[in-house]
Each structure stands twice: as C-alpha cells, then as structure tokens.
Design a protein with these regions (language model features):
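Short, flexible helix-loop junctions that flank or precede catalytic/ligand sites
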Residues: 1-131
Length: 131
C-alpha cells in the first residue's frame, strides 16, 4: 500500500483493489495498512466500491446481474477529514459534502425501482451492515 501511495504522489495513476465494507472505509483500510493519513489524503483521487447483485424477475426468481456502485471523489472536505484521522461517520459526512454517491443512496434507488429485492441486497452487502 505504501509503495502504491508513493507512486501516486509522483504522478502515476494507480488502480488497486482492497477489501473494505464501503468506499469510505477503504480510506481507513489504507491507514490500517500503514499509510500515513496525510499521504493517503494527498494520493487519493477517489474510491469506487462495487457490489454485483442479481436482477429480480417479476416471478420472484433472479436472472442476470447488475452493479451497485459507490463513487467517492477525494474532495477538499474528505481530504481534510482523512488528515485529521476522522472516523467513519465524519468521513462519510465529508464524502457526501464533496458529492459522493454512497451505497445507501444507490440501494434505496435500486429497491425503489424494483431492480432487485432486499433479500438480495442483504446477501451481497455484508448482511446490510454497510447500509
């Protein structure tokens, strides 16, 4: 993680994956892996979290899949929150202020549109803990 952050700080575009319950919690995961908060704040351009869920059919069965995407740009407020080692709630508020599209909002729109059901969301989204 530290090598990737150093590369990002020198102008390289870095795409990476890591396991975290949400895009905001991925930022905390970086610091858990030894990246200094001020470096993470400077290196990040944004974080995307995705979940692949099954499409609900009208008969209650499933066919096909689609992606729930959470997109968190690293705006000024989020970077400031990262630098001060803010917790999940403050990071989430900062991300939302910077225009993030967060998973709970994506889930609400998806359920309202009838694209899948709550059972499938709970199955895929870690038992509903991330929303």
């Amino acid at each position: 993680a530290r090598i990737a952050v150093r590369a990002a700080l020198t102008g390289h575009v870095i795409f990476s994956t890591l396991h975290a319950p949400s895009a905001v919690e991925a930022v905390i995961r970086l610091t858990d892996m030894g990246v200094a908060p001020y470096l993470a704040a400077d290196a990040l351009a944004g974080v995307v979290s995705q979940r692949l869920v099954r499409c609900r059919r009208s008969d209650g069965s499933y066919q096909g899949r689609f992606c729930l995407c959470e997109v968190v740009p690293a705006g000024r407020r989020l970077r400031d929150a990262i630098r001060r080692c803010a917790g999940v709630r403050d990071l989430t508020d900062a991300a939302r202020s910077d225009g993030a599209v967060l998973l709970p909002d994506v889930i609400a729109r998806t359920l309202a549109a009838g694209r899948t059901d709550e059972r499938e969301i709970r199955r895929v989204c870690e038992g509903g803990s991330s929303w």
